[in-house]
A protein has these predicted regions:
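An N-terminal, well-structured beta->alpha segment
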Residues: 2-13, 18-109, 113-114, 139, ...
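Gly/Ser/Thr-enriched, mixed-charge loops and adjacent short helices
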Residues: 37-45, 58, 154-280
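Buried hydrophobic positions in well-ordered alpha/beta secondary-structure cores of metabolic enzymes
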Residues: 53, 92, 129, 142, ...
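N-terminal small/polar loop signature for handling phosphorylated ligands or for N-terminal nucleophile
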Residues: 78-82, 86-153, 240-298
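Short glycine-rich phosphate-binding loop at a beta-alpha junction
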Residues: 85-95, 119, 224-226, 328-333, ...
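Short glycine-centered, acidic/aromatic-flanked micro-motifs in structured strand/loop junctions
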Residues: 93-95, 227-229, 299, 383, ...
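Proline/glycine-rich low-complexity loops and linkers
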Residues: 128, 172-208, 300-373, 380-381
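Phosphate-binding and adjacent anionic-ligand microenvironments
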Residues: 282-284, 321-497
């Protein structure tokens, strides 16, 4: 892409800052029976269809069917319109998956059957829907995406009128309504049946919003940026945002065909981005996932920089400038112990939550914090956006590089000294309560005592599949690998008991 420039706009506090809303429930720090030294709150309440980030599964296979989507559309419209004297307006955005058309039409049908108005945004990033829900004063926003999953999966996640993801309690109410249609009352008839319309400039509105989060006194002129949009929702918006701020942009993953989203590209597969950064001698590489709510960055040396490192470097600068609220960073139980120690050295602290960016956001809102995220790359700059936004996070990293006049590799090395961390995924036939897995529980207690204050053990179920995740941290990687193998073997024994 040719280098372009545009007039820099002064950030608009009204459009860049989400509307204030009532605080969400307190954050959850241990998930699905997780065993974690840093656990600070009970696990999220189990629901039938909703997981850690909405409903997700293989498209056209239960639960991710058009039949369920139709029922969900009806339930959302009922809740969004409750107590209002107007037909609820509900936005629908999606990523580039082939199955998105099917799910979109089913949701729209359910909404219209309840008298709701549907605004179709087309393929846009998840954070674009969150922003548009507030800027257009909609009653809800729906995103059809399975994020980083392969193309044959899909999912549905929901934002309230305030631009924030729904809490567990609201999702539980939707499930109850979906399972008992009598609770929804009569369907709309005649002229009260809803209608659907397209929002033609949804991408343009988001591009303007994203650019407003970049400091008006800085310019990306002369900065070389490689963007990998994963053939996903940001395939048009992300390159445009950086180019219009002056960067020389090279674009990867911008030719979606319905089945190539996340395929060997994007945040999960940064190898191609690394090669292109080195080839172009770029200053930074930015890899997004399918719905562009997270990013992984690559420095000028071709080294991958994850969410923990980005949070550490941004927190350090914000503390120095007096901008980090209460000198506190919010992250999940999966973030490296080194991040905790880095915050302590800065005179700050780290608050941990359950896995899932919405639990991070809930903790930020209830605690009055403004920076948080996940190791996986969901980064929330609450002064700018109400949810994780890979494009905006990339802009904040670029602003940090320009402010400090330091290369990304230097910033990352200075900010975070990692503790060795091992992640082991164990596929099992079905989920069982962790407390019922006696061999695993007994060994977990021994391992926790062995690690002491020098390490951590976290054992939790995946939020979307029967996969046990074991995370170990400590000073000796070889010891961690041996312990991880022993724990995995214990879990397999329990699974067959």
């Amino acid at each position: 892409m040719a280098k372009t420039t545009s007039k820099k706009q002064k950030p608009s506090k009204t459009s860049a800052t989400p509307k204030k809303a009532a605080p969400s429930p307190a954050p959850k720090a241990a998930q699905n029976g997780a065993t974690a030294k840093a656990a600070e709150a009970p696990a999220p309440r189990a629901r039938k269809w909703f997981g850690t980030d909405g409903i997700r599964g293989m498209a056209n296979v239960a639960p991710m069917t058009p039949e369920l989507a139709l029922q969900l559309g009806r339930a959302i419209t009922f809740v969004a319109g409750r107590g209002k004297n107007h037909a609820p307006r509900i936005l629908i955005g999606k990523d580039t998956r082939l199955s998105g058309y099917m799910i979109e039409q089913a949701l729209a049908s359910g909404i219209c059957s309840m008298g709701g108005r549907v605004i179709l945004c087309g393929p846009v990033p998840t954070p674009a829907v969150a922003h548009l829900a507030t800027s257009m004063r909609a009653d809800a926003g729906i995103v059809i995406s399975a994020s980083y999953n392969p193309f044959d999966d899909n999912g549905i996640k929901i934002f309230g009128a305030d631009g924030f993801k729904l809490p567990d309690e609201a999702e539980a109410e939707l499930e109850a309504l979906m399972q008992d249609e009598r609770l929804l009352g009569p369907r709309a008839t005649g002229e009260n049946i809803g209608r659907a319309e397209k929002l033609e400039d949804s991408r343009g509105r988001y591009v303007v919003f994203a650019k407003q989060t970049f400091p008006s006194d800085l310019s990306l002129d002369g900065i070389k940026v490689v963007v990998d949009a994963a053939h996903g929702a940001a395939y048009r918006t992300a390159p445009l945002v950086y180019a219009e701020l002056g960067a020389a942009v090279t674009s990867l993953g911008v030719k979606p065909n319905g089945v190539n989203i996340n395929a060997g590209c994007g945040a999960l597969h940064p190898e191609g981005l690394v090669a292109e950064v080195l080839k172009r001698k770029a200053d930074i590489g930015i890899a997004l996932d399918g719905d562009a709510d997270r990013l992984i960055v690559v420095d000028e040396k071709g080294q991958v920089v994850d969410g923990d490192a980005v949070m550490a470097m941004c927190a350090a600068r914000m503390i120095k400038d007096g901008e980090l609220a209460k000198k506190t960073l919010v992250a999940t139980v999966m973030s490296n112990l080194g991040l905790e120690r880095a915050m302590a050295r800065l005179g700050g602290k780290l608050v941990r939550t359950a896995v899932g960016d919405r639990y991070v956001v809930e903790a930020m809102r209830s605690g009055g914090y403004n920076l948080g995220g996940e190791q996986s790359g969901h980064l929330i700059f609450l002064d700018h956006a109400s949810t994780g936004d890979g494009t905006i996070a990339g802009l904040q990293v670029l602003a940090l590089m320009l402010r400090t006049r330091k290369a990304l590799s230097v910033l990352a090395a200075d900010a975070l000294e990692r503790v060795p961390q091992i992640l082991e995924n164990v596929n099992l036939p079905k989920k069982k309560p962790l407390e019922s897995m006696s061999a695993l529980s007994a060994l977990s207690d021994k391992v926790t005592k062995k690690l002491g204050d020098d390490g951590r053990l976290l054992v939790r179920w995946s939020g979307t599949e029967p996969k046990l995740r074991i995370m170990l941290e400590g000073p000796d990687e070889a010891v961690l690998r041996s312990l991880a193998k022993d724990l995995a073997d214990a879990a397999r024994r329990d699974a067959t008991a």
